């Protein structure tokens, strides 16, 4: 799939289906890294999100250009949701929908100022949705803190068909820890703290930031506070001194 450039290429599911069915006697672990949503936000039907009717998040400056781009962003999320539906339908067709743990997550916040490339909540607090028929309660929400490093240990524990909650003995010590007890409803908590790091390289000049959160409060430390934060994808220029993202100039000019 290539949705980062325009013109785009349609996504295909043949490889996914082939991987799921390559050996019915063996379980599988499949990671599908969807490109969407990603700038330039050209997938989906943006007409379904008229700029004047959009409700912007409070951290985004309300300008006409921001509304237009945010509508395209929402359209691409809708397109991605359709992709997820097709993948789940493919899993259903293999006959393994009921015995497969499905995890859906996101890489980081959206590519708007103050989101992606920051350690703020809008940059690092992402979705995590789980589905596992007969094991994960549908519709249940939890405030348990987890990090990406916890996913692998969780999958390893879930693959233990005899005792899923048993901490598997690995030849190496993973950086994370299994949150399977949370998924199975055995615990409402996992971590006391989650951590974040951003150095701004190669996205711009060095501007290292470290963060820690207990789920309610977030502490950030700028290691070079006297430096200027410049993120080239938002504030940088491309050929003929054109801004990479035009909405940034409207923030400076109109707010």
Give the location of each predicted region:
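Extended ligand-binding clefts on enzyme/binding-domain cores
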Residues: 205-206
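Short, surface-exposed beta-edge/turn micro-motifs
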Residues: 192, 216-217
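Active-site-proximal cap/lid insertion segments
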Residues: 1-7, 17-173, 198, 211, ...
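Active-site loop/lid in soluble adenylation, ligation, and acyl-transfer enzymes
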Residues: 202
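Extended, compositionally biased low-complexity polar/Lys-Gly-rich tracts
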Residues: 169-185
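Polar, glycine-rich mid-to-C-terminal structural blocks
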Residues: 176-181, 190-198
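Basic phosphate/pyrophosphate-binding loop/patch that engages nucleotide-derived ligands
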Residues: 21, 92, 184-190
